[in-house]
């Protein structure tokens, strides 16, 4: 018999209640809980009170959460990956193609497949005392993560299945530096690159190493330790990777931002908040930005419910009246309602733009669940909903990878056919290419001058968009962040004169600023996208006209080239909107994260930081009283001014447009270089006229055509 569990989990009887029922001291009951040996008179009293028979009472054992089991659907995606890469590797030698053709037609295909066919990641986020590691251990089926996880270190732990361990390593645990060459986040996707792996690694060993670097008891809480990876033979990791993140809100805001930026890598978010203090305002402010950054996987034509990759967990649920279901349902309802009251009216707009679905508070409420190892029934809904998403997501990834490969092949076929036609025409119609080269050289100076003028116009337009963004934001702030405006909002929205209502209002007010700023930036970025589209079309027309006059095929794809260049730059500002709009199905945005709207997440770090500063300095309870609306408004305006909130937004917007301008300059310089190289190579081919080399290229291109036709999709 487990007497303590019998009282708490089965009959829901407190020690105080049993004390009165049996007329015994509470200390005596605690002794029985320790030795599981209550006297028969107590058993009889419990049987009489509950209706349970003696055998049920005496044989009762604490319920145990069943081992989490899910169907291994990643094997289908893994099969696709192995099949395609085996096909590519087996055919590369047979294709007999040079590096230039390989780079032009095959490298992006390989990179896109690599980026698409990555296991989904689950991130566990919450304050340091919410039981993240306990929940992870339960899902893993063994105590791999230390339950005494420290809030004083910014280390993120990636859990992967042992089958995914790179061939060049043997140990279970690896610790990586927090920074290297100016980069602050170790890229877990590059673990199969030995040189990269070794450069970031600072320690390796067994699971004890994780305890040394990541717990209060450990003696190696080194500042330079930023991430760890653990390889475990756990069934759940066959379908997904897990990221265990340090609790936020424990030390510096910068650590919270690091946690947030790491969580953005995830495809599934599990947010934990203690049931006994569920969804406090700090949770709400942090979760709002987490959800904004969460990939939108649900669409009208797939099996996923709305917000399928989000679970908000009321953890340690046994602490609420011994896990009383009615009390917990009310806690979930109230937490969801507080969250809903704290978001701006257009909070869901960016997600709706991707999914074409509308979102309600009820949709969000469906993602709120309970969890505690002490009462298995309170884990069922969490496990059922998690099981759905981790079983279905690998199938979605597999399908998207296949669609990507098909779209890529279809998109490159045209250029491939044009290049093949070029070499065939060079054999039979060389004179036309001699004329073409002469015509290009004759017109190139003027074309370059015209192109330079267009580039300068776009540079000026980017600067103009930057000023417009700042001006519109400043105008919005001057009208919104005022005592009069805030008082009016408080009255119009009928905010109640209590701490919780005012906290929700302040959170919503800040969220509205985030949303409005993102909307302004999105509109300006969309405007730039139209301009870049027109520029690329104009660029293509300017080089195509010389070919068109001679009825020759053009095999220089300016659009594809420009997009490839942008994707390789890294920080691209507003050009990211252009890539999403024009080339979202290509390798540039492979994987689930490509569905995220940039402007919706750009200001998330500010939202997290400002939210913490506002509530730390507001002292809301002291403001409530007879003239509370004006008191709250004055204090809120004062906090915005004190923390220079508007300036922080302007800094982000300025950097966004500066990054845009720098990326555009790099892209057009490289585009022009590649066009010059193309013309130079074409001239060399026409002038030297090496028939053997031309025929070899024809053979290679036909081999690539056959390769595309027979690719196993």
Regions found by a protein language model. Name each.
Residues 6, 12-35, 40-129, 142-231, ...:
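N-terminal low-complexity/disordered regulatory or targeting extensions
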Residues 429-671, 675, 679:
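A non-catalytic, extended alpha-helical scaffold characteristic of dynamin-superfamily P-loop GTPases
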Residues 1:
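Basic, amphipathic alpha-helix used for nucleic-acid engagement in HTH/winged-helix/SANT-Myb modules
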Residues 356-360, 364, 385-433:
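Charged, amphipathic alpha-helical linkers/stalks
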């Amino acid at each position: 018999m487990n007497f303590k569990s019998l009282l708490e989990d089965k009959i829901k009887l407190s020690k105080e209640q049993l004390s009165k029922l049996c007329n015994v001291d509470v200390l005596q009951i605690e002794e029985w809980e320790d030795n599981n040996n209550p006297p028969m008179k107590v058993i009889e009293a419990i049987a009489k009170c509950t209706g349970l028979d003696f055998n049920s009472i005496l044989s009762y054992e604490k319920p145990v959460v069943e081992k989490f089991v899910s169907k291994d659907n990643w094997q289908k995606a893994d099969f696709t990956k192995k099949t395609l890469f085996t096909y590519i590797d087996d055919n590369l030698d047979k294709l007999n193609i040079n590096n230039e053709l390989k780079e032009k037609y095959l490298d992006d295909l390989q990179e896109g497949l690599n980026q698409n066919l990555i296991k989904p990641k689950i991130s566990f986020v919450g304050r340091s005392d919410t039981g993240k590691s306990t929940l992870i251990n339960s899902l893993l089926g063994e105590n791999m993560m230390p339950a005494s996880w420290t809030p004083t270190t910014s280390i993120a732990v990636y859990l992967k299945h042992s089958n995914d361990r790179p061939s060049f390593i043997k140990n279970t645990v690896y610790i990586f530096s927090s920074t290297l060459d100016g980069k602050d986040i170790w890229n877990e996707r590059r673990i199969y690159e030995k040189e990269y792996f070794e450069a970031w690694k600072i320690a390796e060993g067994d699971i004890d190493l994780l305890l040394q670097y990541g717990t209060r008891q450990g003696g190696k809480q080194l500042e330079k330790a930023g991430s760890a990876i653990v390889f475990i033979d756990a069934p759940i990791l066959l379908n997904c990777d897990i990221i265990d993140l340090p609790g936020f809100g424990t030390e510096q805001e910068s650590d919270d931002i690091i946690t947030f930026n790491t969580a953005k890598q995830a495809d599934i978010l599990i947010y934990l908040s203690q049931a006994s203090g569920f969804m406090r305002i700090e949770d709400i402010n942090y979760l709002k930005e987490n959800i904004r950054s969460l990939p939108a996987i649900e669409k009208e034509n797939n099996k996923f419910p709305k917000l399928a990759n989000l679970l908000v967990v009321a953890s340690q649920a046994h602490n609420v009246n011994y896990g009383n279901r009615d009390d917990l349902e009310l806690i979930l309802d109230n937490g969801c309602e507080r969250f809903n009251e704290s978001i701006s009216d257009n909070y869901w707009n960016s997600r709706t733009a991707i999914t074409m679905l509308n979102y309600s508070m009820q949709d969000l409420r469906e993602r709120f669940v309970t969890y505690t190892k002490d009462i298995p029934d309170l884990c069922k809904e969490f496990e059922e909903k998690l099981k759905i998403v981790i079983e279905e997501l690998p199938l979605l990834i597999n399908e998207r990878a296949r669609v990507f490969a098909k779209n890529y092949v279809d998109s490159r076929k045209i250029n491939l056919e044009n290049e093949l036609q070029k070499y065939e025409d060079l054999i039979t119609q060389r004179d036309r290419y001699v004329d073409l080269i002469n015509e290009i050289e004759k017109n190139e100076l003027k074309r370059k001058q015209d192109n330079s003028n267009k580039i300068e116009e776009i540079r000026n337009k980017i600067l103009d968009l930057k000023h417009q963004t700042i001006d519109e934001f400043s105008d919005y702030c001057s009208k919104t962040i005022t005592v009069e405006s805030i008082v009016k909002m408080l009255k119009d929205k009928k905010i109640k004169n209590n701490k919780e209502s005012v906290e929700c209002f302040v959170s919503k007010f800040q969220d509205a600023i985030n949303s409005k700023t993102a909307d302004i930036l999105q509109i300006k970025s969309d405007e730039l996208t139209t301009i870049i589209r027109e520029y690329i079309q104009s660029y293509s027309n300017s080089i195509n006209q010389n070919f068109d006059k001679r009825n020759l095929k053009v095999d220089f794809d300016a659009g594809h080239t420009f997009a490839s260049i942008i994707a390789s730059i890294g920080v691209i500002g507003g050009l990211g909107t252009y890539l999403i709009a024009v080339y979202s199905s290509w390798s540039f945005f492979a994987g689930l994260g490509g569905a995220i709207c940039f402007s919706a997440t750009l200001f998330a770090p500010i939202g997290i930081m400002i939210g913490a500063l506002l509530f730390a300095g507001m002292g809301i309870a002291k403001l409530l009283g007879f003239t509370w609306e004006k008191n709250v408004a004055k204090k809120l305006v004062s906090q915005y001014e004190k923390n220079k909130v508007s300036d922080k937004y302007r800094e982000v917007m300025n950097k966004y447009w500066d990054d845009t301008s720098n990326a555009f300059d790099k892209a057009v310089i490289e585009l022009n270089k590649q066009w010059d190289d193309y013309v130079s190579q074409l001239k060399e081919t026409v002038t030297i006229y090496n028939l053997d080399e031309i025929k070899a290229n024809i053979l290679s291109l036909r081999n690539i055509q056959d390769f595309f036709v027979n690719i196993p999709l």
